[in-house]
Design a protein with these regions (language model features):
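Terminal leader/tail segments of proteins
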Residues: 1-172
């Protein structure tokens, strides 16, 4: 197993890294993303990780692996000095078994026309792991980046401290 990466060593401006780590996201009794199923016999579809100083990686998921029927465009946008203008989607979940129907506002985002350095993630999706029922990366359950504002994915492969963690107010 590789040594964990220290997020303090990640670059600023952030770096885009390709990965073949499998991703599965479940919410409300549904699968929102499954890169293994989408990849079929060829193996999991590749993902992108954005790695930035003091942030766990934010993962960008290929549209082919997403259950797009659960997404609706949402009002509002935000701007990242590195990636550009982000558009949001609400996650609209129908009732399934014991899971009631619900809408999670702005739970997913994407950059439709990112800056040149981040062109590979154009149209790909990122999400807030803390809003999902379960998120797995390379078979490991993901923890959300603290604070609710950021969309980083914490696994045993990254070591903090992480921006947004109230235990490290100098990073907030």
């Amino acid at each position: 197993m590789p040594q964990p990466e220290r997020v303090a060593d990640y670059p600023r401006p952030p770096e885009l890294r390709a990965s073949d780590d499998a991703v599965r996201v479940e919410i409300g009794g549904q699968v929102l993303c499954d890169t293994v199923a989408a990849g079929g016999t060829a193996g999991p579809l590749a993902i992108w990780k954005v790695c930035e100083t003091f942030h766990p990686p934010t993962v960008y998921l290929p549209p082919q692996a997403m259950n797009l029927a659960l997404l609706e465009p949402a009002a509002g946008r935000s701007f990242c000095e590195w990636k550009g203008l982000a558009s949001y989607c609400d996650l609209v979940l129908p009732a399934v078994g014991e899971h009631p129907s619900r809408r999670l506002q702005r739970a997913v985002w994407q950059y439709l026309d990112p800056t040149p350095a981040f062109a590979p993630i154009a149209g790909w999706y990122a999400l807030y792991p803390g809003l999902m029922d379960a998120v797995w990366l390379a078979g490991e359950r993901v923890l959300p980046q603290p604070g609710g504002f950021y969309g980083g994915w914490i696994t045993s492969q990254v070591v903090g401290p992480f921006k947004g963690d109230p235990q490290h107010p100098h990073l907030i």
